[in-house]
Curated annotation (Swiss-Prot):
GO terms for biological process: translation. Keywords: Ribonucleoprotein, Ribosomal protein. The lineage of its organism: Archaea, Thermoproteota, Thermoprotei, Sulfolobales, Sulfolobaceae. Belongs to the eukaryotic ribosomal protein eS1 family. This is Small ribosomal subunit protein eS1. GO terms for molecular function: structural constituent of ribosome. It comes from Saccharolobus solfataricus (strain ATCC 35092 / DSM 1617 / JCM 11322 / P2) (Sulfolobus solfataricus). SMART domains: Ribosomal_S3Ae. Pfam families: Ribosomal_S3Ae. The keyword Acetylation does not apply.
Length: 208
């Protein structure tokens, strides 16, 4: 083995493995481990998983979840939910000819001050008129915005990823035109409450 190869191997051995844990809202489930020379190097890393990996329900395999490492408790890395996305294959499977696809992208604020960008999706049974699309898009926006304002961030994300909010949209929008499916296609956290960020930073420093 070359001296260079040996040095690389030795450097890898110097790394320590840290366990990555989901937030309490997602059951504090292990997302696996990540290596680092120092635990502070893990802060900011993004981890991807699926809802199926957390629940064991294969019907949820198309729901991709994203978490960001924000601190630590000993050797356990604390994460925050930062968004979700439905798989492209799943979305393609929903598309039908001679039907309308209605998207709406907008920002909402939860009861505890998180700002989240939401992409809603509704698919109709047949082609609908522009006025009906506008009415359905309004329902998407109003339903999601109202729910966000009433719920904490943790509760809102549960409503989103488990499909309950999409079901509410479906029930309201089907009164405008026959529907095939409603989904929250994607979310992304744009802003967290300022005081929360300071608390996380303090926790990370004291636990390091």
């Amino acid at each position: 083995m070359s001296a260079k190869g040996g040095a690389i191997k030795d450097k890898w051995k110097m790394k320590k493995w840290y366990s990555v844990i989901t937030p309490k809202a997602f059951g504090e489930v292990s997302l696996g481990s990540t290596p680092a020379y120092d635990i502070t190097q893990t802060i900011g890393r993004r981890v991807e998983t699926t809802l199926y990996d957390l629940t064991g329900d294969f019907s949820q395999v198309y729901v991709h979840l994203y978490f960001k490492i924000i601190g630590n408790e000993g050797d356990r890395l604390i994460t925050r939910f930062v968004g979700h996305e439905l798989s492209r294959d799943y979305l393609r499977s929903l598309i039908r000819r001679k039907s309308s696809k209605i998207n709406s992208i907008f920002d909402v604020t939860t009861k505890d001050g998180y700002v989240v960008r939401v992409k809603g999706l509704v698919l109709t049974t047949y082609k609908c008129h522009q006025s009906q699309k506008t009415a359905i898009r309004k329902i998407i926006n109003e339903t999601v915005s109202k729910k966000a304002s009433e719920l904490s961030f943790d509760d809102f994300t549960q409503e989103v990823v488990f499909g309950r909010l999409a079901n509410e949209i479906f029930e309201a929008a089907k009164k405008i035109y026959p529907l095939r499916k409603a989904e929250i296609e994607k979310t992304k956290v744009l802003k967290v409450p300022e005081n929360l960020g300071k608390q996380v930073e303090s926790s990370s420093v004291s636990s390091g």
